[in-house]
Structures are given as C-alpha cells and as structure tokens.
Amino acid sequence: QKLITPLASSSAEPPRNKVTVVGVGQVGMACTVSILLRDLCDELALVDVMEDRLKGEMMDLQHGLLFLKTSKVVADKDYAVTANSRLVVVTAGVRQQEGESRLNLVQRNVNVFKCIIPQIIKYSPNCTILVVSNPVDVLTYVTWKLSGLPKHRVIGSGTNLDSARFRYMMAERLGIHASSFSGWVLGEHGDTSVPVWSGASVAGVNLQKLNPAIGTDGDKEQRKATHKAVVDSAYEVIKLKGYTNWAIGFSVADLTESIVKNLSRVHPVSTMVKDMFGIGEEVFLSLPCVLNGSGVGSVVYMTLTDAEVAQLKKSADTLWGI
C-alpha cells in the first residue's frame, strides 16, 4: 500500500515568491527571520562564503519550519541555490567598526560586490535587488552598474530605517505611536540625511505651521536634537552591542512585503535621482518611492523648502564625491 500517490505528472512547481538573502551575519539573519515570520516567501535561499555558519543557520531555520508558513529553506555558497528568486536582499560585506563612518566602508565592500552581483543576475535575471550593506547609497549605485538591471529593479534600503527612527523618537516625545506621526528623512542613509520638517504632521496637522522655527537653531522645542539623535543612534547602538540588526531586519521585511505583495506603499528608499531636485549626477539617494511588484514603480516628488533642497543637493554631492 503506497502512502502517497502523485497526481501531477510534472516535477514540483517553481517557487513564485522566492526570496534570497546574501550574507548570514547579524543583519542578514535579522532580515531572514523577519521575512519568515511575516510569511512573505514560499522559498527562502541563503548564501554566504562562511560555509559552516551558513549550514548551521540553514539547519536551525529548517528545524523551526513547523512553526512557519514557508515550506522550503535552502542554503549554499554556490549561487545556483538562488535560482528563480523574485527578490534578492544583499546584506553581505564588511561591517562598520565602532566610530567608522559608513562612507569609509566603500572600497572594502565594492570588491565584495564584484563577486556577488554577477552571480545573482546569472541565476535570477528577472529579480529585484534590495541592497542593505553600507554605505547603502553608494553600494546601490555599484549594484545597478554591475547588474545591468533597469534602475527601478535596484533599490537601496536607504532612509527607511532613519525615517522609522525619526518617527519613533518624535512620536515618543508626543506620547503617540510612531505610525501616527508622519515624518520623512531623505537623502543619504547616514550623516548628511535630511529631515523634512516641512512635511512633519500628526493627524494632518502640520508641525511647521504650529512652530515655524521647527528644526532650526531658533527652535524653542529643540527638535533639531531629535534628528541628530537619529543620525547618532546607529553609532550608539554599535557602541553598546557591537552592531545593529533588529530594526534594519524589520525595516527590510517591510520593504519586502510591499514588493512581493505588490502593495504600492510609499517608502523612503534609495533610488536613482538624476534630474530630480536639480541633481545632475547619476547618484542614488532616498526619496519617497512607490514600491510594488516591479520594484520602484514611481517616485513621489515631495514639496520641499529651499533649505531642504539645498541639503538634499549637499547629500548628493557628498555621495557623488565618492
């Protein structure tokens, strides 16, 4: 007596929502677990050069598949395992040391990407790539150049996390939940990021209308300190625990959801901004982007003040200088 009788003659269906995570360090695994817990893929592939660590993480996840809604977790140092990925999340690279700026990491990580990106494209030519490794804006540009993909399919996690930190800190001061505070941080993910004070609001009430000095040195409420805290927060967490991983993991899962579920939600992520806000170079930095099944479906042109546009250009110049 046979236990299971196959009915479909063909071999197994190819996955429809396969997600690959490249790099199984602290950030890669936080992204992986966040994506799994939100049921965003039907197959998950992991890739890394450290074979033992990779196999260990794979086995550990497989042992918990009973508690998840994903049927298959695979891993290998060979990129063949990533074939047919819909989305590839790149977290590989060398990590920021305590006190090291994100931009200092550039050359070390560009070399890593030269090995990774062509392999991804070889096995998943139709994928969308989400770059998380720092300095994310520069590496997203590098990925775009190395991959040959159209610009809408190469996305950097950008200031999605900076905006989340900003919204959390501002909301905390106001005694409300972060989701009820609307605020955007644009530009570089890092030291020259731009807080859009002109667009900060709660329940449709614009904060700059209530306090025209908001975010400036003359602000009695010292809101400028909140943005400084956003910029400094990663450095502080790294100083305390050695790395940041949970918040970026949640942030990446949120972006993943908008892409694989074709949600057309707006997120501040890194995209090619040439010819926007008077930026002439092919530089990647964060603007509000509509994320859907095709990647960045469109860019929302925010009405910024002259000072904010100037800061954005400065952000672009900093990045292009690299």
UniProtKB/Swiss-Prot annotation:
It is found in: Cytoplasm. It catalyses: (S)-lactate + NAD(+) = pyruvate + NADH + H(+). Pfam families: Ldh_1_C, Ldh_1_N. Its main location: cytoplasm. Substrate binds at R102, N134, R165, T244. Pathway: Fermentation; pyruvate fermentation to lactate; (S)-lactate from pyruvate: step 1/1. InterPro entries: L-lactate/malate_DH, L-lactate_DH, L-lactate_DH_AS, Lactate/malate_DH_C, Lactate/malate_DH_N, Lactate_DH/Glyco_Ohase_4_C, NAD(P)-bd_dom_sf. The keyword Cytoplasm applies. Homotetramer. Interconverts simultaneously and stereospecifically pyruvate and lactate with concomitant interconversion of NADH and NAD(+). Belongs to the LDH/MDH superfamily. LDH family. This is L-lactate dehydrogenase B chain. The gene is ldhb.
